[in-house]
Amino acid sequence: MANKLPNQQQHNPCSAEFLKQPIAKETMTMVNATDFPKPSFISVNGVDLEVFEAGQPHGGKPIVLCHGWPEHAFSWRYQMAALAAAGYHVIVPNQRGYGNSSRPTDVSAYDIQHLSGDLIALLDHYGYANATFVGHDWGAMVVWGLTLLHPTRVNKVINLSVPYIERGEKPWIEVMEAVFGDDFYFVHFNRQPGVADAVFDANRFQFLRNMYRKNVPPAEPQPGMALINLAKIAVPLGEPIMSESELDVFVSAFAASGFTGGINWYRNLDRNWHLLADVNPIIQQPTLMIYGDRDSVQKSQTLTTFVPNVEVVNLDCGHWIQQEMPEETTKAILEWLEQHA
C-alpha cells in the first residue's frame, strides 16, 4: 500500500487487516443522486451556500467536508453516511462558485479570506466553536488556508491529495510561469481570463467524463494546455471512476453553475500569497494526510516542517481518492478520528 516518503514521518493508521474488514452496508448507501440528502440553503458571509448534511445537527461532533475542482459536494457521497453513523454531524457545502451556491462576479470574492470566511460563518450558523475539516484537491488548499487564518476554529485537519504548500519568496503564479511556462493551466487561467471557462462550458460532458478517470496509461509529459485540450478529446483514456448516473450529477451541476466560479479560485492564488504573508505558517492541529500513489500531484518532502503533528496514509489510487477507493478512504478517516478522539 504505502511507499515511504523521504524525510517524513510515516504512520499508517489503517492496518492491512483493518482495511480488509467491510464497512457495514447501512453506512455505505449514499452512492447515487437518489440517496444523496436534499440540500439546505444557508446565508453566510454575504453568500448563500447549498449545504448537504448527514447526522443530527447539534447532536454530533461537527465535521466539514470540502470538495475540490472541478467537483461538487456529491464527491463525498461515500463518506457521509459512515461518518454520520460514527456520531458526526456531517456538513458538506457546495462552496461559493459551485452547484447552486452563490456565484459572485468579482474575482477577488474567491480569495482565501472569503472561502475560509464562508466556512467559519457555517460554524457560527450551527453554533459550533470548532470542527474537524476535511479537504480534497482545492478543498485541501482551502482547509490549509483556513487553519492558518483561523486556527482556533479548526479542531483537526484531514486532507487528501494536495499537501501543505509553503508560501515561498515569490507569488505562486509567478513561480509556476517561470517553471512551467505560460500555457500551464494554473498560469493560463490567470493570464487569459475567460478562455478556458468557455472551452469547458462548451464541452462540459466530455471534459468531466475525461477528467474523472483512473488507471490512465503512462504517457510522455504534455504541454500545459493538455488539461484544457482534455475537454475536446472524443475517446477518454483509462477507466471511469463513477457510473453514468453519477457523472450526470456533476454534468448537471456544472450546467447550472458554469466553470468560472471554480476557476476564479485559481485566479486568486497570488492574492492569497499576499494575504497569508503575516500568518504563522506552522499548523499544530492533529492532521491526517492521505495521498494516492498514482496521483499526478506530488507528495511533499517538507510536510512535517510545517505540519509537525501529521500522519500519512498512502493508497493505491490516483487523484480522485475518496471516489476511487471509497471504503479504504472512509476507514482511514474513521480509525484516525477514533485514535484522536
Regions found by a protein language model. Give the residues of each.
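Flexible "cap/lid" subdomain of the alpha/beta-hydrolase fold that forms the substrate-access gate
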Residues: 31-38, 48-49, 55-57, 62, ...
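Short, Lys/Arg-enriched N-terminal segments with co-localized hydrophobic residues
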Residues: 20-29
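Active-site helix-initiating loop/hinge in glycosyltransferases
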Residues: 68, 111, 324-325
